[in-house]
Amino acid sequence: MGQTLIADIGGSNSRFALAGAAGWPERVLVTENAMVADLETAVARYLQETGARPRAATFAIAGPVLGEEIALTNCAWRFRRAELANRFGFSRLQIVNDFEAIAWALPQLTAAHIRPLGPGALPQEGVKLVLGPGTGLGVAALLPVGRRGYAIASEGGHILFGAHGTDERGVFDRLHEECGTVSAEKVLSGPGLPRLARALHPERGYREPEAVIAGAHRGEAAAQAVTRLFVRLLGRFAGDMALAFKALGGVYIAGSIVCGLGPLLDEAQFRAAFEGHPPHESLLQAVPTFLITSDQPGLIGCAALAQMNELAQAQT
């Protein structure tokens, strides 16, 4: 058995590591995607800096994993599976969706990696759902199958999204003017936060999510109104997805955007929007919600997958 290279390839940043024997990532390095030409260059740089010579690789990709050629949704990178494996001598190359990898990580996470998001019952036996805004909006689920469960990817972040109530109609009208068809990802993502800010306060001209969050932390009323609406919409979307998957095992929110909100993440408002889905309020009241505080759940999931692959290979 040789080393396995693992990677969480996001729209803005990529994390590389080696899968440790205990099923956890080791020797983690982070690459800013804009600073390298393509995935092959990023992989080569990691291998050069660490001196690692992995025989296998498990990558999580922020985009749909279909066919031989794979393209990231919010990054210009694209690659072909066989060419990548041949260039680096991988005897096995496994590619999964980035949020599918996080779903695989859920059984590994402890109290050091998550915290409750609002009150809620204990998780029941059933589907666990993970979602979160980053460069895009990811959604995946872990089905209660076998000892570890079975993760499935989705493209739920691209469902159409709209106003609920008169106070949101003008906002969504302006969102439609700016970006045409409004999907959940157009609003609930890093690029979506300033987009939402421009729709709510067009005179402010917000361009970066960091500017909105920093303004809200400073007490700027306009920015705080944006983050309040963002939290409400995130709670509503999470409730939508929890109903779609009947996620009695709990809903887990990932991503640096939500973690960066800190005290701006009004848990009562989030839960109210999450539960406000008649006639199934009581069902959602029984579904606990959690915030993933670890900054590398995708790598943890890839390491778990690599360990599963090694165990399966040892048994053959």
Model regions and ranges:
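Conserved phosphate-binding catalytic cores of ATP/NTP-utilizing and phosphoryl-transfer enzymes
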Residues: 1, 44, 92-128
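Short beta-strand-loop/turn "lid" adjacent to the catalytic site in phosphate-handling enzymes
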Residues: 49-95, 104-113, 130, 259-263
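Glycine-rich phosphate-binding loop of actin/hexokinase-like ATP-binding domains
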Residues: 113-183, 262, 270-275, 279-284
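Short, acidic Gly/Pro/Ser/Thr-rich loop/turn segments
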Residues: 14, 64-66, 136-140, 195, ...
